Amino acid sequence: MLTYETWEENETKGALSVLSWAYKEYKSEIVYACSFGVEGMVLLDLINQVNPSAKVVFLDTNVHFQETYELIQKVRERFPSLNIIEKQPKLTLDEQDKLHGDKLWESNPNLCCKIRKILPLEESLANEKAWISGLRREQSETRKHTKFINQDHRFQSIKVCPLIHWTWKEVWRYVYKHSLPYNSLHDIGYPSIGCEKCTLPVGEGGDSRDGRWAGKVKTECGLHYQ
């Protein structure tokens, strides 16, 4: 039954309760891996309500859009107490080119993601018991069975997904209601934003992730495989 007291929790579809449980359960041994997409803006706001000094890691591949880096600065200003860490890969782009050839994101996108995303996240999670992700069930077939609390065999960790029941419209409704900053690329046809080299705009009516690795069999960077 919807009451005044339960309105906030109804609006967040269980997300606040999940986050409160996660920070109580794992205390300082949990980190939010944020890509700074629109779901990330919602989660940052919710996390800030539960734990204003929470750890947030951004996997800086060095090939993100400039708009993404600009958004991170806006988020730092909006949530100054959050501990935002920009995690770098061990290899610079020049070092990667020398080892694997130019434009690895074209010749071998799986290896590129491993070097610039998966290995850095492994390092970031090495001393953590759990991590938070903005996965939603409606995003894709590979994500439709995601639970609030998941055993992550890939990273030998617990993956907490507070937004699994949120729809795309509900995410944006929350962003607008709370005047949250968001990536300006969303306004010009980019529903899902990753690295600049592997992200294209999506036409009207297209799937929200159609612009990721367009023209390739690849649909995930590898962070969310079990």
Curated annotation (Swiss-Prot):
Signal peptide: none annotated. Keywords: Cytoplasm, Iron, Iron-sulfur, Metal-binding, Oxidoreductase. Its EC number is 1.8.4.10. It catalyses: [thioredoxin]-disulfide + sulfite + AMP + 2 H(+) = adenosine 5'-phosphosulfate + [thioredoxin]-dithiol. InterPro entries: APS_reductase, PAPS/APS_Rdtase, PAPS_reduct_dom, Rossmann-like_a/b/a_fold. It is found in: Cytoplasm. One of its GO terms (molecular function) is adenylyl-sulfate reductase (thioredoxin) activity. Binds 1 [4Fe-4S] cluster per subunit. GO terms for biological process: cysteine biosynthetic process; hydrogen sulfide biosynthetic process; sulfate assimilation, phosphoadenylyl sulfate reduction by phosphoadenylyl-sulfate reductase (thioredoxin). Its cofactor is [4Fe-4S] cluster. The active site is at 221 (nucleophile). It is an enzyme of class 1 (oxidoreductase). CDD domains: PAPS_reductase (cd23945). SUPFAM superfamilies: Adenine nucleotide alpha hydrolases-like. GO terms for cellular component: cytoplasm. [4Fe-4S] cluster binds at residues 112-113, 195, 198. Pathway: Sulfur metabolism; hydrogen sulfide biosynthesis; sulfite from sulfate. PANTHER family: PHOSPHOADENOSINE PHOSPHOSULFATE REDUCTASE. Catalyzes the formation of sulfite from adenosine 5'-phosphosulfate (APS) using thioredoxin as an electron donor. Belongs to the PAPS reductase family. CysH subfamily. This is Adenosine 5'-phosphosulfate reductase. It comes from Bacillus anthracis.
